[in-house]
Amino acid sequence: IIELNEAMPATMRGMHDIYEPADPPVRREIPVYKPSDRIGTDCIKVEPSKIVAVVKTNRPNEVGKFSPLDETTAKIGENVAAFLEAEMKAGRIPASFLPIQSGVGNIANAVLGALGENQHIPPFEMYTEVIQDSVVGLMKEGRVKFASGCSLTVGADKLQDIIDHIDFFRDKIVLRPQEISNNPEVARRLGLI
């Protein structure tokens, strides 16, 4: 059964990277060496004989709203950014920085916002599970260069911003299957923070 959600424009095609590893014993490593690597196709190919139905919908994705940042979450973000800056100065993180893997929610938004505001931290890439609201703004500001994830968990206004400026975002966001976004081999290879 295929769902065709007409609320999502066809112009979003190209943001996806569908990769299916080979079966053992010939399976190789997942060939992601930087977050922006595209290793698969932008769609799933299915034998037409296997399709039993197409369900048409026209429903935008619904994402619960996060509370606004408060003094505590802002301070957590500032502390994490200051810690990572100190680690760079001490040489434990390269001067070019490393990709970020963030969680989702207010604290993750606070940390990402603080990283974006800290001018001692260079523009960075993300290899994460969830791409959320703060990432959209940081991309527009040039602070996040690229984000790889398995979902866009953004509010309606941010999703509309992505859709309205798809030519800008299509080359800066890739959506992958969860087994690729959360793969420990890839996370270790990239040196995710």
Please place each PLM-identified region on the residue numbering.
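Conserved phosphate- and dinucleotide-binding cores of soluble alpha/beta proteins
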Residues: 1-99, 106-193
